[in-house]
Amino acid sequence: VISMLQGAPVADPAASLTTDGVVPTWMTDAAERFATFERAAYSGTYPVAEIAFSDDAHPLDVRMRVLNPMVPGDVEVSSIPTGMFEFTLRNTGDYAVHGTLAGSLLNAAGWDGITPIGEHTPGLGGNVNRLRRGGGWARVVMDNPSLDESDQFAGQLVLAADDESAAVLARCAGVEHLHAFLASRALNDGRSRLATAPTIGDPQLNAPRGGSGPSAAGRTWLGVVGVPFWLEPGESRTVRFAMSWHFANRMVDVEQFGQPHPEWGASRFYLGNAYALRYPDALAVQDDVERRWNELVARTTAWTATLTRSSLSPREVDHLAAQEAYVRSPTCFVGADGRFYGHEGSLGASTWMWSGVFGGSCPLNCTHVWQYEAALAGLWPTLERNMRDTEFDIMQAPNGSIPHRLRVPVYLPQMTDELIGGPEEPALDGMLATILKSLRDMQRGAGRDWLAARWPAIVRLYRHIAEKWDADGDGVLHGIQPSTHDIDLAGVNPFMGTLWLPP
């Protein structure tokens, strides 16, 4: 019996306007080819998900726990580019069971993340997968040496399992090849020969061969790692998988606001990723994850336990845990310059807008949107202060105002003397928030030195607001007030006024 560790597809995966519910065709096709488990039950608190699989056709219960390391206050651990999976298999039958738990990963180096992957996909081709065993793990290292090192889509991925004797199909051509590999698994699989020949991917002699060399133009390889198991009745075993990645060359790939600058032509602007300065490649990420596995799991689950064991209701726990999800989604990133950057959100199949369906929406560090966000300051206050530094050092205009959008890279001219867009002039609620957030930064441990360095800029901003909207000093804001609604408010109103209320 060959089954995907996936619940049976539902008839109508409808989603709300804030969640993508589109299931890719390749996933439904694979589910039909491999079959799925009859039942799948989800539980968990972000960033930990637990799924229990069961099926009357299987004498096994399977429990999967998956997480990405996340520790409040520790930015580096919380931005390790990896996914960590633990599968616990338990024999629920009356007889011994043997099988293979396999994971597969597409070598996506060169893919733009947008073009549909088919028989011939531009960007793919020349992809290379390599086997690496050692330290109790079996790995497939994936990259594309045909790309220049500076290419936006150059990078590396690693799929690994914590069984050095796992059967590895490093270069799998597709779903049918994968199915043939899984169907060929035998109890007498020849693993003993790996002791003297560790470079063999699959030690089983009567099994499908893998591909060889770089992938053909427009094509790529899957990497497959299969861990064999034998379980007596009532016996269980836990198998760990990880997938790690490293794509250093983040570029500006969204349309920025403000006036057009045709003089920039077709220039591609580099932003990079901070994690790429800590790790030279994905194999280094994977080495770190393997070495620190127990620590990373313990520190991550300590956070979720803090929530779930509190006096909060389950609904409140879910609400609070969800707040950190967007900070660690593609909405946000830390560039190679060490600055924290955040879009207003992420685009997708159910969240499309004028700028399309891919990437981040409405760049960048929008003060009139991020002013209503609180998780960053509570969980990673250094990143919150990082945003203040950008607002004061880069975005602030000579007259003290702060445009509500950042243009990147930050060495480009900012929108201090041009129409910004959404709204056209600097958003007042965003500027008021910068002052209030500076107070919160102090309350969260920024220190007197930070305040002393920022005080002149805070005063300039305060005076700009007071002179333009509260010239009579009565503590009430007057006039046209650009806001987060991408429109201007007019006259006295509590929405904007309660952000002011000076002593």
State the predicted function of each range.
Residues 204-222, 228, 235, 239-240, ...:
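Substrate-binding groove/exosite segments of carbohydrate-active enzymes
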Residues 49, 83-85, 99, 239, ...:
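Residue-level detector of short, conserved catalytic/binding motifs and their immediate flanks
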Residues 18-82, 174-225:
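Extended, loop-rich substrate-binding clefts of extracytoplasmic carbohydrate-active enzymes
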Residues 89-93, 97, 232-252:
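Ser/Thr/Pro-rich, low-complexity mucin-like regions
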Residues 53, 64-66, 101-105, 235-247:
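Short, hydrophobic/aromatic-enriched beta-strand segments in well-ordered soluble domains
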Residues 2-4, 14-15, 74-77, 99-102, ...:
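Short, solvent-exposed loop/turn and secondary-structure capping segments
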Residues 497-503:
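Active-site neighborhood of glycoside hydrolase catalytic domains
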Residues 64, 69-196, 225, 256-311:
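Polysaccharide-binding surfaces and accessory modules of carbohydrate-active proteins
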